[in-house]
Amino acid sequence: MAKLIKKISLRKGKRRIPKGVIHIQASFNNTIVTVTDIRGQVVFWSSAGACGFKGAKKSTPFAAQTAAENAIRVLIDQGMKQAEVMISGPGPGRDTALRAIRRSGVILNFVRDVTPMPHNGCRPPKKRRV
């Protein structure tokens, strides 16, 4: 006799999210764009590495722009109209990721730079000699 097998759904259904928070983490090696709802639960994320860029190409501004456009495309499908942007990190992709979000048509309530700044904390890494 055949057993009934439960279907396990891996993805949640489409949620309607009118307002959210877009976090851009721009490091020297990669740019990660995470979208959360107002309560802080992650809705979608994208990164330069997840968009197909590998190695040194992940740290380029174009890779950051592609990651931001990828995240925004999913958000517009879920009905997001307004967003707040939090930018963190000193990487080269922070400005181009923000530019891609501005072009998308989502209304930005505010853009905040939340990069942690040390008050003379740990010693930074040495300068590179190439």
From Swiss-Prot:
Keywords: Chloroplast, Plastid, Ribonucleoprotein, Ribosomal protein, RNA-binding, rRNA-binding. It holds the Pfam family Ribosomal_S11. One of its GO terms (cellular component) is chloroplast. It is found in: Plastid, Chloroplast. GO terms for biological process: translation. GO terms for molecular function: rRNA binding; structural constituent of ribosome. Belongs to the universal ribosomal protein uS11 family. Part of the 30S ribosomal subunit. NCBIfam families: PRK05309.1, uS11_bact. This is Small ribosomal subunit protein uS11c. It comes from Physcomitrium patens (Spreading-leaved earth moss). The lineage of its organism: Eukaryota, Viridiplantae, Streptophyta, Embryophyta, Bryophyta.
